[in-house]
Design a protein with these regions (language model features):
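Basic, helix-initiating cap at the start of DNA-binding domains
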Residues: 1-38, 42-51, 68-71
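C-terminal peripheral helix-coil segments that are non-catalytic and often amphipathic
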Residues: 1-11, 149, 153-161, 185-257
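Short hydrophobic/aromatic patch on the recognition helix
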Residues: 52-63
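Alpha-helical DNA-contacting segments of helix-turn-helix folds
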Residues: 70-80, 120
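Hydrophobic alpha-helical connector segments
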Residues: 72, 86-116, 138, 172, ...
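Secondary-structure edge/capping motif, primarily at the C-terminal ends of alpha-helices
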Residues: 88-92, 124-128, 190-197
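Helical hydrophobic small-molecule/effector-binding pocket
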Residues: 100-126, 146-153, 179-184
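Short secondary-structure transition hinges
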Residues: 115-150, 163-174, 199-203
Length: 257
């Protein structure tokens, strides 16, 4: 489950184009392993070349810089997120449950791929974007737009069915952004700052702190059914059991080692 960087290959490629694509995917996979071991600061073009059967010049033929390589990793991360979010949005339940399923998917992704989940934000810093190729930035923008559209669709369905009232002063874009911000921040803290006093305290007193954060947010905008009227912990477990059983089992096994 973890570490998969496979990509859907476009059809109709020539043999040479396919070979170039395969080589690029191989180099991205090598870069991913370097990042997992040493973090983004440890990633260099020299290390990628040394771990491959290609010269540094060949690596530069595919990526204009280390930052361009980080952007390529980010497109892989976004592609994996989208695949998991699409599976989650097919969950059979009301639209708040579907949104919760997306949050479950993101929590799983962050546990399975901590390096890639951090890459999505790192790739948007000026230090990276200023040295990334236009092709790579365009790919990231396209994937981000696809991610946002998934959130927008759930919002629209919730409003159409009267589950959430969008006639107030808070626009749907703000609610979608708040969900992303809360999900990213909470998962980053639990995965990267687990020794923090605030994290330790909330884990000792709450069964599912991330779910509590989601409920605070969605109850705050009045998304029905409210958490006082519905068992969303049960929904969380159903998502794990019905949509992501393999990923959930992998994480449980990893934590028990």
């Amino acid at each position: 489950v973890s570490g998969s960087l496979s990509a859907t290959k476009p059809s109709g490629l020539t043999r040479k184009q396919q070979a170039l694509l395969d080589r690029e995917q191989e180099l991205i996979a090598i870069a991913f392993e370097v990042v997992k071991r040493e973090g983004f600061t440890g990633l260099t073009m020299d290390k990628v070349a040394a771990a491959s059967s290609y010269s540094k010049g060949t690596v530069y033929n595919h990526f204009t810089s280390k930052e361009d390589l980080i952007a390529a990793l980010a497109t892989k991360a976004l592609s994996q997120e989208i695949a998991m979010f699409k599976r989650a949005s097919a969950f059979k339940g009301n639209n708040r449950e579907k949104l919760l399923a997306v949050h479950v998917a993101y929590a799983l992704f962050c546990c399975l791929e901590p390096a890639l989940s951090n890459c999505v934000l790192s790739c948007r810093t000026p230090a990276v974007t200023e040295k990334s190729s236009e092709k790579r930035l365009a790919a990231m923008n396209s994937l981000e737009a696809e991610l946002l559209s998934l959130g927008d669709q759930i919002m629209e369905l919730g409003a159409a069915r009267g589950e959430v009232d969008m006639s107030g002063s808070i626009p749907a874009t703000s609610i979608v952004f708040a969900n992303w911000a809360m999900g990213f921040g909470a998962n980053a803290l639990f995965n990267s700052a687990s020794e923090s006093g605030a994290v330790v305290r909330v884990q000792e007193t709450c069964e599912n702190p991330i779910l509590d954060c989601i409920n605070l947010l969605l109850d705050g905008v009045g998304w029905k059914p409210l958490s006082t009227e519905f068992n969303y912990q049960e929904t969380w477990q159903r998502v794990l059991d019905e949509i992501f059983p393999e990923e959930a089992a992998f994480i449980r096994q990893s934590k028990s080692l």
